[in-house]
Swiss-Prot record:
Function (record text): Involved in the biosynthesis of the central metabolite phospho-alpha-D-ribosyl-1-pyrophosphate (PRPP) via the transfer of pyrophosphoryl group from ATP to 1-hydroxyl of ribose-5-phosphate (Rib-5-P).
Family: Belongs to the ribose-phosphate pyrophosphokinase family. Class I subfamily.
Protein name per UniProt: Ribose-phosphate pyrophosphokinase
Pfam families: Pribosyl_synth, Pribosyltran_N
Protein residues bound to D-ribose 5-phosphate: R204, D230, D234, T235, G236, G237, T238
Recorded GO MF terms: ATP binding; kinase activity; magnesium ion binding; ribose phosphate diphosphokinase activity
């Protein structure tokens, strides 16, 4: 059996989709449980079949899926897993989405557009999820899209600990890639010894996806070792451009830090050649450092395991952030 037992009753069960089984195994190791066996396969027409190999009746179930490419396939697989647990009489179902899909579509920019991030929350609820866990949502308002508890976890302590251990904080300047993430940059600056801040002002094209048409630095980065942060990096165009702007403004060096390394082509080429000393990310999405000498991948598994344990024990997830959630 793979469940963790409490008071002679089967309780905690961890389930993994096929997108990133390595992360689920790492979380399971932290929790001292096994990932519950599941049969999953694709039919010839692209439909997905899932079935769990053990009883889930009365269990506290946690369904982990990383939404990497092909994103829509893995999203559908997680929804089917949740539906199967609901129909199998699971007591409580928590959907764990380390990287929340469609998070950038959290509002209408123009008429006749969907609010896709809200739809994802509705789909999770309809499938049978009682709770959602995610890491560093693109915008905080996504927490309100789901009609139930949402645990919004933060990777900042993991990333800042790496900075503290590997860089001299005396000359650090924390840089936000845009004005919208200045609040997050302030938290980073406080954590890194009240470091000075700057941000990159950018103008994004409304017609061409992932294209920045202009940007400039607001703040003094001359001679500074800059930590350029963001929640996610997709094609890397914005961040690579920001590195260039910081270097032109006199930055001594630039380190890039992000929670979600989407890294769609040609991100690897751009970030390898942009002049950044290091690109730091986590494994909320599957990563490979092969052929990418300046990429560092930190594990999110301990954070997810502690979160799962607090939920399972009916504890306080907020305590993981010393009162900041």
């Amino acid at each position: 059996m793979t469940a963790h037992w409490k008071q002679n009753q089967k309780n905690l069960m961890l389930f993994s989709g096929r997108a990133h089984p390595e992360l689920a195994e790492a979380v399971a190791k932290e929790l001292d449980v096994n990932v519950t066996p599941m049969t999953a396969r694709d039919f010839a027409n692209g439909e997905i079949y899932v079935r769990f190999e053990e009883s889930v009746r009365g269990s506290d179930c946690f369904v982990l899926q990383s939404h990497t490419q092909p994103l829509n396939k893995w999203l559908m697989e997680q929804l089917l897993m949740i539906d199967a647990l609901k129909r199998g009489s699971a007591k409580r179902i928590t959907a764990i989405l380390p990287f929340y899909p469609y998070a950038r579509q959290d509002k209408k920019h123009r008429g006749r557009e969907p609010i896709s991030a809200r739809l994802i929350a509705d789909l999770m609820l309809t499938a049978g999820a009682d709770r959602i866990v995610s890491v560093d949502l693109h915008t905080d308002q996504i927490q309100g899209f789901f009609d139930g508890p949402v645990d919004h976890m933060h990777a900042m302590p993991i990333l800042t600990d790496h900075i503290k251990e590997n860089y001299n904080l005396d000359n650090i300047c924390v840089v936000s890639p845009d004005a919208g993430r200045v609040k997050v940059a302030e938290k980073w600056a406080n954590t890194l010894g009240d470091a000075p801040m700057a941000f990159v002002h950018k103008t994004r094209s409304t017609e061409v996806a992932n294209q920045v048409v202009a940007n400039r630095v607001v703040g003094d980065v001359d001679g500074k070792d800059c930590v350029l942060l963001d929640d996610m990096i997709d094609t890397g165009g914005t961040i690579a451009g920001a590195v260039g702007v910081l270097k032109k403004a006199g930055a001594k060096s630039v380190v890039i830090a992000c929670t979600h390394g989407v890294f769609s082509d040609p991100a690897r080429e751009r970030l390898s050649a942009c002049g950044a000393e290091e690109v730091i990310t986590t494994d909320t999405l599957p990563q490979s450092t092969e052929g990418w000498s300046n990429l560092t991948v930190l594990s999110i598994a301990p954070l997810l395991a502690r979160t799962i344990n607090e939920i399972f024990e009916n504890g306080s997830v907020t305590t993981l952030f010393e009162g900041e959630a």
